[in-house]
């Protein structure tokens, strides 16, 4: 299946390159659109899936109208885009407009180094992991700017909560990725996946030797995206919508889009760092060449990556429907007193496992 997709892309790439410098620019723009458009469409269907799944958990139907609920998210998008963006009279006008853009831009830029397969990646950067850490850290600036520019105590309180929470859990996430870097010997995302390849299937994935780091990264990813049960930033019972309380229309839609794009991104990164990315869980167990349409089941391919991502994206919804919101002090305690010490200890354990050959870096 991967070969079939690449056979469609390569001739198109060569045709654009044949147009000269202008063709190279157009090809770059096309690659950006090939990332942005699917992300936007995926967010729309993800919202529908969230409503449906929570509806089933509540023993109700969920969205049933507008194409059996499938197109309800698109209807919501059009509704928000055609609504007026009301700016408070006391707000800082320029900063108020820049804030949602500053939140959305890093959420989309991070996708440029995410590999969907061995050859399906926009930019196979050698420092992809460091680039991701930088991009995912920039989003908090838009949130802080929104809270300050709104000139509202509720928005500012939500922004301050977000800043403290994101900074706290970024440290734990960064330490967890140090363990991944030690185990793989690389900061290139494709090389991290290749380091988990082998003839033992899922036993070669980093999920098993780095299981504590996997849990830390997963939970920290939920906290990083301000989702339940770590959604004190938008605590409805306390500060309404937090930093977004003064936003409406298209500006609110940009914040909404950035949040869900980050949720999907975290699901991708967990799958790449700990579950072998596009690798098959039975890789090495079956050696057969039958058809490109089914060989990916044991050879690996982007469908495996999408299935793993679907699981973690659905887990976000499960967390929201199942767990009560943490208090702010409990969130800080979990990040600083539990996750950071745990990751530091397991970094040392990972180094020892690599030194004594317990972790093998691919085949």
From Swiss-Prot:
Could you tell me the EC number(s) of this protein? 7.1.1.-
Recorded GO MF terms: NADH dehydrogenase activity; oxidoreductase activity, acting on NAD(P)H, quinone or similar compound as acceptor; quinone binding
Indicate yes or no for the key word Cytoplasm.
no
Q: How does it sit in the membrane?
A: Multi-pass membrane protein
Kindly state which keywords UniProt assigns to this record, in alphabetical order: Cell inner membrane, Cell membrane, Membrane, NAD, Quinone, Translocase, Transmembrane, Transmembrane helix, Ubiquinone
Q: List the transmembrane segments.
A: 62-82, 96-116, 127-147, 163-183, 202-222, 238-257, 264-286, 299-319, 339-359
- Cellular localization per UniProt: Cell inner membrane
Q: Which GO terms describe its cellular component?
A: plasma membrane
What reaction(s) does this enzyme catalyze? a quinone + NADH + 5 H(+)(in) = a quinol + NAD(+) + 4 H(+)(out)
- GO biological process: any one? aerobic respiration
Q: Which EC class is the enzyme in? A: translocase
Q: What is its main location?
A: membrane
Q: Which Pfam families match?
A: NADHdh
Q: PANTHER family given for it?
A: NADH DEHYDROGENASE SUBUNIT 1 (PTHR11432), NADH-UBIQUINONE OXIDOREDUCTASE CHAIN 1 (PTHR11432:SF3)
Cited function:
NDH-1 shuttles electrons from NADH, via FMN and iron-sulfur (Fe-S) centers, to quinones in the respiratory chain. The immediate electron acceptor for the enzyme in this species is believed to be ubiquinone. Couples the redox reaction to proton translocation (for every two electrons transferred, four hydrogen ions are translocated across the cytoplasmic membrane), and thus conserves the redox energy in a proton gradient. This subunit may bind ubiquinone.
Q: How does it assemble?
A: NDH-1 is composed of 14 different subunits. Subunits NuoA, H, J, K, L, M, N constitute the membrane sector of the complex.
Q: Which family does it belong to?
A: Belongs to the complex I subunit 1 family.
Q: What is this protein called?
A: NADH-quinone oxidoreductase subunit H
User: What species does this protein belong to?
Assistant: Xanthomonas axonopodis pv. citri (strain 306)
Q: Which gene encodes it?
A: nuoH
